[in-house]
């Protein structure tokens, strides 16, 4: 899978790598490529330089760590069931010549009866002419992809659109727990970890990931990495509605709330200036642990800076993070 991105100035682009990795792992893909790492000479600009920047986007870079741990380390199981549809050469030619398929919408399973939500639940594949049929697979008619909660057949990833305008992606695997989307005001009890996101600039939208960096699982670990981030932009960058040109927001450290807008946006190629501003989203985490643990804020190089207070409630160690700590990531470690 190549050339994937949620381009800036998309206000929700902190989700980019996580969304790709979760479903790439579920589909058991061989490789994924974000577009693009950085194609300009100003490699240390300290600001997002264009729509597709990865290397100067703090949250896209930080979330490459849980992305790697999930996808490359194989921390999430591929979907159990495989749904296939056969596409022969003549049918492919007809789809293209009729204009039904085109450069940015090449022939895919949607033309052959596979429901758009099926890949959120099962593995899917096209069987092209000359390819053998898998010994065990389901046809599109054999499966039902009904929502509003699209949970994978492994139970490790779910896309919840119970509120169509406030979707949430949840990953719950042995070494990764992610809550991505409009998650504020809810409590996510994920067996050994409870995540309780709070309100954000984007009306409760944010990214919270917890990854086992040292250890086998959330029952047996020595070190965790927590990322809690949201809106990412450049200082002074103005976001406008694409059609009307109406200003939605001007980025600054004084920004308190953003208009909830579900339409095309643009910065009119005015990318503001350094430094990039990143929202550290507030959340409370409850981690089940039999030993004492400590939590630290991290600087931009990953070094410990400030200790975060932890309280004890039954089997849980509890702490809260947020914008007051002026960081997007934290280390949680078992006390030696």
What are these regions (language model features)?
Residues 281-320:
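Proteolytic-maturation and junctional protease-sensitive modules
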Residues 226-230, 241, 246-290:
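Proteolytic processing hotspots in large secreted/extracellular or virion-associated proteins
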Residues 97-250:
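Active-site-proximal substrate-binding groove within the catalytic cores of carbohydrate-active enzymes
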Residues 315-336:
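C-terminal beta-strand-rich structural cap/linker in extracellular carbohydrate-active enzymes
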Residues 10-11, 16-20, 209-212, 280-283:
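Short alpha-helical segments and helix-capping/turn motifs at coil-helix boundaries
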Residues 1-140, 144-148, 152, 157-159:
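Catalytic-core region of carbohydrate-active enzymes that cleave or remodel glycosidic bonds
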Residues 12, 44-45, 236-239, 307-308:
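Short conserved micro-motifs at the rims of enzyme active sites and ligand-binding pockets
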């Amino acid at each position: 899978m190549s050339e994937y991105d949620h381009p800036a100035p998309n206000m929700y682009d902190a989700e980019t790598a996580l969304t790709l990795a979760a479903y790439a792992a579920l589909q058991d893909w061989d490789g994924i490529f974000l577009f693009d790492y950085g194609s300009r000479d100003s490699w240390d600009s300290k600001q997002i330089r264009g729509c597709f920047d990865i290397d100067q986007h703090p949250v896209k870079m930080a979330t490459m760590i849980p992305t790697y741990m999930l996808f490359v380390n194989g921390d999430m199981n591929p979907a159990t069931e495989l749904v296939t549809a056969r596409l022969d050469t003549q049918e492919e030619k007809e789809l293209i010549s009729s204009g039904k398929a085109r450069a940015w919408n090449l022939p895919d399973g949607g033309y052959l009866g596979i429901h758009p939500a099926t890949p959120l639940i099962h593995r899917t594949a096209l069987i092209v002419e000359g390819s053998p049929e898998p010994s065990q697979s389901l046809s599109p008619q054999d499966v039902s992809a009904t929502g509003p909660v699209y949970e994978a057949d492994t139970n490790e990833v779910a896309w919840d659109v119970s509120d169509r305008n406030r979707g949430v992606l949840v990953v719950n695997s042995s070494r990764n727990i992610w809550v991505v989307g409009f998650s504020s005001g809810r409590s996510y009890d994920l067996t050994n970890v409870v995540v309780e996101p709070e309100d954000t600039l984007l009306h409760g939208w944010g990214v919270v990931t917890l990854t086992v960096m040292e250890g086998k699982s959330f029952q047996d670990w020595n070190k965790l990495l927590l990322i809690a981030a949201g809106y990412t932009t450049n200082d002074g960058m103005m976001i406008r509605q694409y059609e009307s040109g109406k200003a939605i927001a001007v980025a600054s450290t004084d920004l308190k709330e953003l208009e909830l807008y579900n339409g095309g946006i643009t910065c009119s190629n005015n990318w503001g200036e350094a430094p990039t501003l990143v929202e550290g989203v507030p959340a409370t985490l409850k981690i089940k642990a039999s030993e004492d643990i400590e939590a630290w804020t991290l600087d931009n190089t990953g070094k410990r800076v400030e200790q975060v207070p932890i309280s004890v409630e039954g089997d849980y160690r509890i702490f809260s993070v947020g914008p007051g700590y002026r960081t997007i990531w934290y280390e949680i470690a078992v006390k030696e």
